[in-house]
Design a protein with these regions (language model features):
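Active-site HxH/HxHxD metal-binding segment of metal-dependent hydrolases
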Residues: 12, 23-25, 33-109, 186-187
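Divalent metal-coordination and catalytic microenvironments
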Residues: 18, 30, 57, 69, ...
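Core dinuclear metal-dependent hydrolase active-site scaffold
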Residues: 5, 17, 97-122, 160
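Positively charged, proline/Ser/Thr-rich regional signature most characteristic
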Residues: 230-301, 346
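Accessory terminal helices/loops
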Residues: 152-166, 170-241
């Protein structure tokens, strides 16, 4: 296991780089924009391929590195379904899993600090974002914060984990790096309350000033998505209606870029070929699956994903590889469902 806790002194933020082995796939949690070059160097030194970048919530004290890492590595971006960020590749709900080679995280929706806050559990560790800090908890007085929701997240989710679970927070201001659930239950001053009302009263009396970066960071972090308009302007997009009208035509092939778990949960467009996004670079090269399909049949590759971000990047990669007939479905499965497009498999009929 490769595990690196990386600190940004300006915002007192922790980021976490995780992989199962040297030379394998990696993910990063809560990357900071100003540290992207550091992350890229570390990835190169460890011979890692970044495949997923996760934000635990929309941060107010630093600008996220999600967009820059996506642009530099073509990684998949991940946030909670409640996030108001314009475009991310995968939106998780409580209980969902995020997987890469040899690593599995389970998403825990923990609203309170913000309404889109998530923690991620991995074996004996939990990455708590700003929900639970070492001897502290996240403030609840902005970004749809709610002290009673925070109490529920803390006492009915995080504090139900085994005492020995290691706690890795999104921030620290005193030089601490790790704690445990048991330590925080016993020694965290904000957890020494007897009711949600007591916790709300404690939090309401903090009278904290807003983070210095808040007016810059929050708007920036809501706009990290890859613009699909630029892809559309080059004639590389189909609307969902156009894609639906083209179903069954002999000159196209639909390419589903999503993970197996996404397909199982949300279904797939009938007749799709599954070519997972992390394998894209190999698949569009000469000899790769998608290159072979396109060159052997002359068919147009029509990419789709969950929200259109991965497919927009995929069509750019395919065009760069000389697959000039390729395009993508703007808005992905999310938009496809909204127009009543056909889906098969998984839980599609119930979603």
């Amino acid at each position: 296991m490769i595990f690196r806790q990386l600190f940004d002194h300006v915002s007192s933020s922790y980021s976490y780089l995780i992989a199962s082995r040297t030379g394998g796939e990696a993910l990063i949690i809560d990357p900071v924009l100003d540290k992207v070059e550091r992350y890229l160097k570390l990835l190169e030194e460890l011979d890692l391929k970044l495949v997923k970048a996760i934000d635990t919530h929309v941060n107010a004290d630093h600008i996220t590195g999600l967009g820059a890492l996506r642009d530099r590595t073509r990684c998949t971006t991940v946030m909670g379904r409640e996030s108001q960020t314009d475009v991310v590749s995968i939106r998780v709900s409580d209980g969902d899993t995020i997987e890469i080679e040899g690593v599995c995280l389970r998403a825990l929706h923990t609203p309170g600090h913000t309404d889109d806050s998530y923690c991620y559990r991995m074996n004996g560790r939990v990455f708590t974002g700003d929900t639970l800090l070492i001897r502290g908890t996240g403030r609840t007085d902005f970004q749809n914060g709610d002290s009673q929701a925070a109490y529920d997240s803390l006492f009915n989710k995080l504090l139900t984990l085994p005492d020995e679970t290691l706690v890795y927070p999104g921030h620290d201001y005193k030089g601490d790096t790790v704690s445990t659930i048991g330590e925080e239950r016993r020694h965290n001053p904000r957890l020494q309350v007897s009711s949600a009302e007591d916790y709300a009263d404690l939090m309401d009396k903090l009278n904290l000033s807003n983070p210095k970066m808040m007016d810059v960071a929050v708007p920036a972090n809501l706009k990290i998505g890859l613009s699909q308009d630029a892809v559309e302007a080059r004639g590389w997009s189909l609307t969902c209606a156009q894609a639906r009208d083209s179903l069954g035509q002999p000159d196209i092939v639909l390419i589903d870029l999503r993970d197996k778990a996404e397909r199982a949960a949300h279904g797939e467009i009938p007749g799709s070929v599954h070519a997972p996004y992390p394998e894209l670079e190999e698949n569009v090269k000469p000899g790769g699956l998608l290159n072979e399909i396109a060159t052997a049949t002359g068919k147009r590759l029509v990419f789709y994903c969950a929200f259109g971000e991965r497919s927009a990047m995929a069509v750019q990669a395919a065009q760069e590889a000389g697959l000039e007939k390729s395009c993508h479905i703007k808005g992905g499965i999310d938009a496809w469902k909204k127009i009543g497009g056909d889906l098969e498999g998984g839980e599609a009929k119930n979603s």
